[in-house]
């Protein structure tokens, strides 16, 4: 009986500690600047998407329905992020970071690249319920990130599909130490896809080479 009581007391202490660490990230958003091609009539534009919560007008879709043409100057940039943290009375949110990576759709988890980190800056706070809410945002600092860096395009006939993956984390201090709160879609993270073209086909390269030879012959004749 004494042993059972000890176990119950220990369990209640654990439960109390868990309740005391209820602080969380309750909103997270990302800004993406898209220019599918510099030769089309559509200019580059930045859209902010909700990853979690309701900070922006649009939620991140499963697909951006976008094909970026790098041969025509197309680009895809991470250009900002926003977030909100809620902290219990004894806790204090120290930071908020957005983590991101890009990989070819279908790549096994073990083969995917490591995450990059995008630091959000503290902006302001309020306490409507007696507990502090903090707002975090970054645009000009740390600046933009080229999400296409190192990616290999597909061809015009067969574009390659890539997946963008995001999650957020915040370090929370409390009297007994610190812990990290995550916003990661229940462990699945937040994802969307896009397509990337073109890597010139062999036929295109051959045509380009023949055009160059013909131009060279014309110059020699002149």
State each model region's role.
Residues 1, 15, 186, 197, ...:
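Generic N-terminal leader/processing signal
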Residues 20-196:
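Mature extracellular "passenger" or substrate-interacting domains of secreted, surface-exposed proteins
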